[in-house]
Every structure is written in C-alpha cells, then in structure tokens.
Design a protein with these regions (language model features):
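Extracellular repetitive beta-rich solenoid segments
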Residues: 122, 170-204
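Surface-exposed, low-hydrophobicity beta-strand/loop segments enriched in small/polar/acidic residues
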Residues: 1-175, 187
C-alpha cells in the first residue's frame, strides 16, 4: 500500500455542492432520475419525467424554465476505495432552489464576481456552469459571486424565483387582489382567459 509523501498546508477553497455561507436559501428534496452513476454534487439539474419529484442532468433541448437548481452535498454519502463519491439512481438528493453554493464549472473557465451564470446542457460538461454564453448553454437566474476555488468549482448565487415563475407549478398570485393591470392572453387549460383591470375581472 502506498503512503502519502506530500502534505498541503492550505485549506481547499470550496467543495462541489457545499453551501457557500448561511445566507437565506431553500433546499428541496428530489429523486435522482439518472440511470447510471453520472449525478454529482454541485451540478445544475432540470426537471425529470415527474416535475417537482425527480431531477436529471440537462441534455440537448433543456430550457431555463425547467431548471430546478444545484445539487447539494449533504455529506451523507461515503467515498469508494478510489476516493470518489457517487449518487445512486433513485436516491433522494437536496437541490438548492435559491441561495449561495459552490458549483461545478467548465474546467477552462475563470469566472469573476458578477459574471452571468450559464448552464451547459450538452457534452461531457453537461450540468456544469460557465460565464460564457454559447449554443450549448442556457442562462439561468443567478450569477458568479467569486473566482474559481480549488479544482473546477466556483461560488455562485441562485436568485429566488416563485414556483410559478420557475415552471414548477403553484405559488405566485393566489387572489385577484394580488394582480394589477394584467392581461392573460394565453388561454388556460380549461379554455378561459382572465382579464383583470385593477377594479374588476371577467372570464371569457
């Protein structure tokens, strides 16, 4: 058995999927819908086949409205003999909806504070983030809040979105009094259109 011969005196900066600080945040429990051992902590994920229940790594065709958040390392998974941590298919996993977290980034990226946040949706880096827009990325509601840490991670902040805005159903305005000068021109599923002028409403 080999022995460790070198030791670092520096504390690593950031671990993929670790919360950046204790500022306001929300973590939802989701089920890993990947069939292999491809899910990792610190990846951006999208809705699976059961929105609000499971998540998967983004692929071609993924859209920002399906973005669920970033997988959180709850420090409950053991390393294997090679030092790797895997998330089993069907396992429950925390997903950060909003807040600050260390996320996986494209290996060649060098983000800076305030850079926009783009999720890579194709290729070997799918699920990682980058500061650069491209044909293989979608912009998600957030930003980089610091430079690259130890390894291919960087601190990011996901902005709060109501459930209605993120496409996960529910939330948003719950009464006409919450609306003001809104014209919903897209028919609802039952074929009705709600128009609210601020003083009255009509259904067509």
């Amino acid at each position: 058995m080999s022995a460790q011969t070198t030791y670092s005196q520096a504390t690593p900066r950031g671990a993929a999927g670790a919360l950046y600080d204790l500022s306001a945040h929300a973590v939802n429990t989701r089920i890993n819908a990947e069939t292999g051992l491809t899910m990792k902590f610190g990846l951006g994920v999208v809705q699976g086949s059961a929105p609000g229940s499971d998540i998967k790594i983004p692929a071609t065709g993924a859209t920002a409205i399906k973005f669920e958040g970033i997988t959180v390392n709850g420090y409950t998974n053991e390393m294997n003999s090679e030092g790797a941590v895997f998330i089993s298919p069907g396992a429950a996993i925390g997903v950060l909806q909003y807040g600050k977290i260390w996320a996986r980034i494209k290996p060649t990226d060098a983000p800076a504070y305030g850079d926009k946040l783009y999720l890579i949706i194709t290729g070997e880096n799918a699920g990682a983030f980058t500061k650069t827009s491209g044909a293989d990325t979608i912009e998600v509601p957030g930003r980089f809040i610091g430079e690259k840490g130890t390894g291919d991670v960087a601190p990011v902040e996901l902005f709060y979105q109501s459930a209605a805005a993120s496409g996960s159903g529910g939330g948003g305005a719950t009464s006409l009094g919450d609306l003001s000068d809104v014209d919903l021109t897209i028919p609802a599923t039952d074929g009705q259109v709600l128009k609210y002028s601020g003083t009255d409403s009509t259904g067509a």
